[in-house]
Regions:
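Active-site and adjacent substrate-binding regions of carbohydrate-active enzymes
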Residues: 100-102, 329, 333, 363, ...
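Short, structured beta-strand/loop micro-motifs enriched in basic residues and often containing a Trp
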Residues: 228-237, 677-680
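Short Pro-Gly-centered flexible turn/kink motifs
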Residues: 244-263, 691-700
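Terminal connector regions
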Residues: 260-291
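Aromatic-lined carbohydrate-binding/catalytic grooves of carbohydrate-active enzymes
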Residues: 289-420, 433, 441-445, 451
Length: 701
């Protein structure tokens, strides 16, 4: 038996090759526990049941200590398979990163129908009380939908259908969150957090990959040997139809999973994962200074990329202090022989490529970086790239996926070369920021040239080749910044997020719904990557009955905006992450424009703290349709940034309990807006807010 210590927890490797994770304080007790024969990965072979540890099945062959973790080796002699489990132990955290590899060392092809990323048991284990008698276990799940991302809910085990009913040692009680398709976070974020509030310990499991996945919470052993487990899997025939024909001498790798146990609560698990995700990210801004973006789409010009509309916005964005100006959708041709999606040719009625360069030059003349919207994976049937060759778009059973609105096949070298050329053309005329969108899912997968493998495996192959393509863009264009947008945050799993500088948190159009989305999003992505729309002076979606209605604010509109409350609320929300400004700010009156500029200046002083902070939730999470007060804190070693919202119809004095974080010498350093009414003592912050008002407070700890 071998033990390895992490920050609060320990990993125990039993003689049969089984490993588990426990509180360091309970290491001795858990070490004495008889381990089950369930391996820390799941393998199914066509025509067989789940394989387990044992002499006639999976045999443990020992471990090797590596530079940053462990390598455990197994064999399944009946099918001549070697399995390697790589465990990376993330320093100063409780995070364990697991990846499994399986190799066929025999002479015959083996058809795999499940190959999971991670599995571990003994959650909430106690010598004195089985898990099903512990009434203090809570399971947190992050629900998601378009314009409603980041919706965390807490459940009891019985509410999820997990309760023992038998003495038999089989998994019959389980709950699963899953995704099928390339919108990997459209329904759930792939993370489950289990809190044992009795012992103050928390377990977590997360996986990654822009394709099919599931995370399963299950019980084994019934009443006799009760065990609670978590499993993460991206390869399963029962979840999207995955299978893989593993040929002789071939090796296959699972996706990574991140799991562990921390002493503490939900926020502590999030903090551990945040440390890992920051270290795992391949792109970060120097010194954590995120350049402020103005994007002309949301509640702004909505894709009507007429220079007569763009240029006044450029002027005002520069005046207010923005550092990037991004031209969003609508700049490219979508009529006649060219396609808006796939060919990336400027819309002739507005400008040609030289005209686009003139706009980029104008943006640069205002000391801002030019940015532009793309959807590099998509192509209309009229696009040249769609018919470049017979394999340029993704197909399923020889039929293009998505019909007229197809998807490029990134396994095709010609596609990668063609799109690299399109990015290069934009780069050469000055664009250094790309907002890359993704507005449809490929479903269960694709069957292009994948040697007869399942569509689900095709989805994995295409996702990985697209990741490689993104990495190649950074190598070729070193000044390039890429934003990931998947109809908001419908594709924001870590494998995509780690290679992008920022992530759109939502396409939400109503400012008062954003705090809920933002608070939940902070638990799944680094705050400095969480791109948050702020749209003071919003122009709502301009198409009524299919007809375009130009924005024309009337007296009623100006009267609604004159007190500045909506502007402040917008800016407070966006300043909790990556400030992403929009709205028709060229119409701002003097008061509102000053409030926008005050916020931008405030943000420039505090953004360096955001990039080293972790989120706290002193008033809990906020549901998207809840009308109550809410608070989000971002805490670092010597600083607490606190946003407080009143999403009710009446004035409130909000008391935010912070006794775990404040000291007697803690003091308020700055507030936004500057006339906000707030106070501080050693245990709380108090803020007076009218209906639909918000305040941002910087506190020196």
């Amino acid at each position: 038996m071998r033990n390895y210590l992490l920050k609060d927890s320990a990993i125990i490797i039993y003689p049969n090759g089984k490993f588990t994770v426990c509180d360091k304080k309970e290491l001795e007790a858990v070490s004495q526990k008889q381990p089950s024969n369930r391996a820390n990965f799941e393998i199914n072979i066509s025509g067989s049941s789940r394989l387990t540890l044992g002499e006639d099945q999976i045999v443990y062959k020992g471990l090797n200590e590596t530079e940053d973790g462990l390598e455990l080796n197994y064999e399944y002699n009946k099918e001549h398979l070697q399995i390697t489990t790589e465990l990376k132990l993330i320093g100063e955290t409780n995070v364990i990163v697991q990846k499994n590899k399986i190799k066929n060392i025999g002479d015959s092809t083996v058809k795999l129908t499940r190959f999971s990323s991670a599995f571990f048991e003994d959650i909430a284990y106690s010598e004195d009380m089985p898990w099903y008698k512990n009434q203090d276990i809570r399971v947190s799940i992050c629900h998601s939908k378009w314009q409603g991302e980041g919706q965390w809910k807490k459940y009891t085990l019985p509410e999820l259908g997990i309760y023992p009913t038998t003495i038999h040692d089989s998994e019959r009680e389980s709950f699963k969150i899953n995704s099928v398709g390339s919108w990997s976070t459209a329904n759930f974020y792939p993370l489950v957090i289990v809190e044992d509030n009795k012992k103050k310990n928390t377990w977590f499991m997360e996986t990654e990959g822009s394709h099919n996945w599931y995370i399963k919470l299950a019980s084994y052993g019934g009443y006799a040997v009760p065990s609670l487990s978590l499993e993460a899997c991206g390869c399963d025939d029962a979840n999207g139809g995955w299978y893989y024909d593993l040929k002789p001498n071939e090796e296959y790798s699972s996706e990574r999973a991140f799991f562990g146990m921390t002493s503490g609560k939900f926020e502590d698990a999030v903090a551990d994962l945040l440390v890992f995700k920051r270290a795992d990210s391949t792109v970060r801004f120097n010194d954590g200074i995120m350049p402020i973006v103005f994007n002309d789409y949301m509640d702004c010009i909505w894709g009507i990329q007429d220079p007569k509309l763009i240029l006044p916005l450029v002027d005002k964005a520069a005046e207010v202090g923005c550092e990037v100006f991004c031209i969003d959708g609508g700049w490219c041709e979508n009529e006649g022989g060219k396609s808006g999606l796939g060919d990336w040719v400027p819309k002739a009625k507005f400008y040609d490529m030289d005209g686009l360069k003139e706009i980029a030059d104008y943006i640069k003349s205002k000391n801002m970086v030019p940015g532009i919207w793309t959807e590099l994976e998509a192509c209309n049937s009229s696009a040249y790239g769609y018919r470049m060759n017979e394999d340029s778009v993704l197909k399923r059973y020889d039929t293009p996926i998505g019909g007229w609105r197809g998807f490029y096949n990134f396994s095709n070298p010609e596609v990668r070369e063609y799109l690299t050329g399109k990015v290069e053309a934009l780069y050469n005329i000055g664009f250094r920021f790309i907002k890359n969108d993704y507005n449809a899912s490929i479903g269960i997968g694709a069957t292009n040239n994948y040697d007869g493998e399942s569509p689900a495996e095709g989805a994995i192959v295409n996702a990985n080749t697209f990741y490689d393509f993104v990495d190649s863009l950074y190598e070729k264009f070193p000044e390039l910044v890429i934003e990931n947008c998947g109809s908001g945050a419908l594709r924001c799993d870590n494998k995509m997020l780690r290679r992008c500088s920022l992530q759109s948190t939502s396409d939400q159009e109503f400012y008062y719904n954003n705090p809920s989305i933002v608070m939940g999003s902070m638990a799944v992505m680094p705050p400095e990557k969480a791109g948050i729309w702020s749209y003071p002076y919003p122009a709502m979606y301009p198409y009524a009955d299919g007809k375009y209605v130009p924005f024309s604010p009337d007296d009623e509109y100006y009267d609604r905006m004159k007190d500045g409350k909506e502007t402040v609320f917008n800016m407070v929300t966006a300043m909790t992450g990556y400030l992403y400004l929009s709205g028709r700010i060229e119409y701002c009156d003097e008061k509102n424009f000053a409030l926008v500029k005050e916020a931008v200046d405030f943000y420039k002083n505090i953004r360096k703290y955001i990039s080293v902070s972790r989120p706290i939730y002193p008033l809990g999470m906020l549901g998207i349709n809840e009308e109550k007060t809410a608070a989000l804190g971002l805490i670092s070693d010597d600083r607490l940034l606190l946003a407080v919202w009143n999403i009710t119809g009446k004035e409130e004095t909000v008391t935010v309990p912070l006794s775990d974080y404040l000291k007697s010498e803690s003091k308020i350093n700055a507030v936004y807006p500057s006339n906000a009414e707030c106070g501080i003592n050693a245990s709380s912050v108090t803020v007076k807010l009218g209906a639909k008002e918000a305040t941002y407070i910087e506190i020196n700890l």
